[in-house]
UniProtKB/Swiss-Prot annotation:
Keywords: Activator, DNA-binding, Nucleus, Phosphoprotein, Transcription, Transcription regulation
Name of the encoding gene: Elf4
Protein's UniProt name: ETS-related transcription factor Elf-4
Composition bias, Basic residues: 169-182
Lineage, opening ranks: Eukaryota, Metazoa, Chordata, Craniata, Vertebrata
Protein purpose: Transcriptional activator that binds to DNA sequences containing the consensus 5'-WGGA-3'. Transactivates promoters of the hematopoietic growth factor genes CSF2, IL3, IL8, and of LYZ. Acts synergistically with RUNX1 to transactivate the IL3 promoter. Transactivates the PRF1 promoter in natural killer (NK) cells and in CD8+ T cells. Plays a role in the development and function of NK and NK T-cells and in innate immunity. Controls the proliferation and homing of CD8+ T-cells via the Kruppel-like factors KLF4 and KLF2. Controls cell senescence in a p53-dependent manner.
Compartment(s) where it occurs, according to its Swiss-Prot or TrEMBL record: Nucleus, PML body
GO molecular function annotations of the record: DNA-binding transcription activator activity, RNA polymerase II-specific; RNA polymerase II cis-regulatory region sequence-specific DNA binding
Protein family (similarity comment): Belongs to the ETS family.
Assembly and interaction partners: Interacts with RUNX1 (via the Runt domain); the interaction transactivates the IL3 promoter. Interacts (via its C-terminus) with PML; the interaction translocates ELF4 to PML nuclear bodies and enhances transactivation of LYZ.
Biased composition (Low complexity): 311-332
Region (Disordered): 136-202, 301-362, 493-512
GO cellular component, one term: PML body
Amino acid sequence: MAIALQPSDLVFEFASNGMDDIHQLEDPSVFPAVIVEQVPYPELVHLCSGLDLDEVHNGIIRDRTLCMTQDQILEGSILLTDDDVSTSNNVSSTEVLFNVATPSDVLDEKQIFSSPEVLSDSNSVQAINLPNFLLSTPEPDDLKKTSDAGDQKEHSEEEKVSREENLRKMGKARKRNRKTKNNRSTSPVTDPSMPIRKKSKDGKGSTIYLWEFLLALLQDRNTCPKYIKWTQREKGIFKLVDSKAVSKLWGKQKNKPDMNYETMGRALRYYYQRGILAKVEGQRLVYQFKEMPKDLVVIDDEEESPETPEDSSQASTSSTPSTSTIRRASSRVGTRASPEDKDNPPWEKPKVQHTGLQPSASLELGLSVDEEVPTTSTMLASPLQSQARLTKTVSSSPAPSNIHLGVAPVGPGSTVTLQTIPLTTVLTNGPPASTTAPTQLVLQSVPQVSTFKDTFTLQTSFPLNTNLQENQVATQGAPLILSGLPQLLAGANPQSNPAPSQVIGAGSAGPSSQPPGTVIAAFIRTSSGTSVPVVKEGPLRSSSYVQGVVTGAPVEGLLVPEETLRELLRDQGHLQPLPSQVLSRGSHNLSLVGNQTLSPPSHPTVGLTPVAELELSSGSGPLFVTEPSVTRSPTQAPFSPFNPTSLIKMEPQDI
């Protein structure tokens, strides 16, 4: 066999030893196995030299890219014509031939696409000419050896590369698909660090397990003895005292109003398999925690036991007066706040205080600007303590004393100070022998241009023995004020010809007569929010204040709400009206107008003026504005005695 190297074609010539004429080579019938193949580009031949076998191949060029005929061109009888030329190129030629015929990829992707043209069709390869080289063909044995060595190298390198790529791809796929999940503990009770409340799956709100909810109920003082309780805390055994209530609470927690014990019981049975809870056999609604959690709040049953009746009775009697009486009294007083003063607090309710008689007691009051609110009032009242204390008799006191009551018109943010002097008057059937001077009740008010005071009188004629209680009580509900005065107003028995008492007004020209034991009950209202001076501790103010003095039998006073007084007076329809006097003030000056008779009220009341009667019939209406004057009645109407203790309704718990 002879191989000729030409610049454009690679020609393999197969001839027999008996051929001498070169022209016979043109006859195809004589040499049917001579084949000429063409390479697409000359530079591609250098790529097939076997130096690039370590690079990754792709599937662009297959067996059909460099086509060969179906007839085999290599046979055992083929001989090389020129051994001297072919010995130097044995290895390179065999590599080129086997690289062309190998079924694997032979070209690198980068080198293929870096060429100016890409092979588009396998059929077009047949029309491309290859450069002609004269190569020496080795023997078939040598070809087999070299081909085996080349194949082993290629396969080993390709397997290594494919394995590395597969490992990388599998590692990336595992990282993308798998997500780390926290191992859930078999028994959450054993993990004290685990929080009770956890975020839900959607990230909204929080969720809580049923066993955690039961633990929370067992540690709550509001539910532990009442709905659920420990039977054996050391063993973790508890009982559902009220299973319906517990299930309702659990339904409220889970936002399921129709939750019942049957549904909750299925959830409890789920914890049997998890090893968290266990059912105590033979006992209904009794469960047990398999493992008790740590840091539990221990609630003793003794702390939750209700108070004994003796303790409750002592607590009720220790308050002066009782809370029930305070609530009843305060419920009768209604105050309305204007829209402008909604931010300001309403009547502040003072707490019950147990102190001795003080020279002065102050109470902070807040009133609206444009609304008329009654500040204080005085009336006959029975003691708010027990009846046993009222029957104590005390000997006569060495000397009477005066009661000074100062009332200032109340504006927004102003204060009312009640000045009192300790009173040691003894109430008996008659004036005590040692009494050297009559008791005086002084009503003092700070003048204001738009302040009006309605005054009416009450007659005390029922004999009552009381012991002066050395305490001061400020009860809840404004303007209910019990300030340093005894609880009862009482006087001597009605005399046939009572000695007239004098009522003196500041700057007045003449006195007016009243039977002994009368009390001036004053309603003071304000209709403007102008600032006014405040009555403070110390002696009485100057004479510019309005003062009403009642002299006569020993009297004592008590401040109660106006609404309470009206309700009590409605119940006393059988009482006769008493002669009344009106002390009205509209400015700093007073003038006395006499010989004016007041018409009796439309229905029986106790000494109410027409203004008070008008307010009583129409509720809290506008006040009757009058000129500054003092009006008195020339004659006195007969009066009938009545029991002042009937004005306050006593209940069994108050006794």
